[in-house]
Amino acid sequence: MKEIYYIVILCSLYLINLGNCSEGTDKIISENGDVKFDLIPKENTERSHKLINPWEKFMEKYDIEKVHGSGIRVDLGEDARVENQDYRIPSGKCPVMGKGITIQNSKVSFLTRVATGNQKVREGGLAFPQTDVNISPITIDNLKLMYKDHKEILALNDMSLCAKHASFYVPGTNVNTAYRHPAVYDKSNKTCYILYVAAQENMGPRYCSNEEDNENQPFCFTPEKKDEYKNLSYLTKNLREDWETSCPNKSIQNAKFGVWVDGYCSEYQKKEVHDNKTLLECNQIVFNESASDQPKQYEKHLEDTAKIRRGIVDRNGKLIGEALLPIGSYRADQVKSKGKGYNWANYDKKTKKCYIFNKKPTCLINDKDFVATTALSSLEEGPQESFPCDIYKKKIAEEIKVMNVNRNNNGNDTIKFPRIFISDDKESLNCPCEPTQLTQSTCKFFVCNCVEKRQFISENNEVEIKDEFKSEYESPINQRMLIIIILIATGAILASLLIFYFFKSNKPGDDYDKMGQADTYGKAQSRKDEMLDPEVSFWGEDKRASHTTPVLMEKPYY
């Protein structure tokens, strides 16, 4: 009978525990995985101290230094050797949408084949010359016929196919060289051009001539973004195969770049402002100020004769020296930007202002009057990327599931909310006060303003933790390393002191018996020792006055 009672008691306890579990996480999470925020009682919640950024994954493609890694306006980020000569070549990993090269004072397009044979230099452009087998310009359809037996190449999208095609050709017979030609893809007619000239800018009287009469002089050219280039994309041998998803190819509508600061996307404190009538002009500005591998000391104005003349008149030796040995020709001036520059911009459609900055953004601010763009982005105003309105609610739900998965097992019914204070669902904020709705937002976002922020943004756009909270975010590993370093340093100091004491205690004193030094006794090391040694009489004779006089004393021989 007792056994039956025990079984009944155990079953009752099991059912009670099972009931408690069902009242936990399962109650607030639906079968499809959605969190029922309205069922969470505020008295059973608390705020996590963990600093997270819901934009981290989304903003990876806007880290231009990482995803592109080279110059944008001028890309010469890699070195290649051809026949014992070093050359600089483009190496960016993302396409530069809308980038073209303008030949100064010329109606010739840079996509025209370079001049060969009896042609005048100014009759040609920068593209590959005619070859026995046509390789440029070539349509995508013809490229697919050319590589019909190579499935891995045919699997590429049109732009990647163009870049891959250009990378197959090397100069002359240098099969082992890393030198590869850049390419341009024109999406309007699906045509691929291989550029014969890797340079993207050639300016200044030393290097080129803008005079139309100088038909056989090198012409001047410069990279630009303008409306006639909107269908073009500048490509290199390093183009990423996943460029469609990993590069910032489009501008973002109803958005501006910002910096994530403890639960909220904040505006940049430091930025440059330009007046622009259109998004196209803003895109041109950020392109012109973007990362560039062009030599910084590039002379664009004075001719050598003018420099010498002015140097003599002004008695300026520096100008004369620059004429004889031009600046920008030194190895140290061969800049590699690695993608660092003013690569991002926010365009205000209402005030017609363009804000550019060189600090990578870590989030987006939803604003109906703005468009966020980059130096890599397309010039086309549509289609643009849409603002992800559900990003905050999704991240809040995800964090609640992760942070509270074991809460019932630990006997704790309190639900933790992440440090995200903006969402299109105000119930998901768990705000202790009434959230404020943003009027400029197209997503109808709500913001919780009554929770103290643990971070702030400095004047240089750096995100820092407030002093009163720093101790909570110091890494235990760093603290442990600091303790280990202090212990090692203390041990080294103690060891040094012990070694010093040991040698000092064993050092001969002033009254050391010199007779113990049998090999050196009587063989003074200096004339001074021989003449002034007061111990000259220590072998039994009385001291005499001569021990203070400069006379040579010797030990008698036994």
Swiss-Prot record:
A Pfam entry, by short name: AMA-1
Chain ranges on the Extracellular side, renumbered to this chain: 22-480
Membrane-related topology note: Single-pass type I membrane protein
UniProtKB keywords: Disulfide bond, Glycoprotein, Malaria, Membrane, Signal, Transmembrane, Transmembrane helix
Disulfide bonds, paired cysteine numbers: 94-247, 162-192, 208-220, 265-363, 282-354, 389-443, 431-448, 433-450
Ranges facing Cytoplasmic side: 504-558
Predominant location: membrane
Location in the cell: Membrane
Transmembrane segments: 481-503
Superkingdom of the source species: Eukaryota
Stated role: Involved in parasite invasion of erythrocytes.
Entry's family note: Belongs to the apicomplexan parasites AMA1 family.
Protein name in UniProt: Apical membrane antigen 1
Gene that encodes the chain: AMA-1
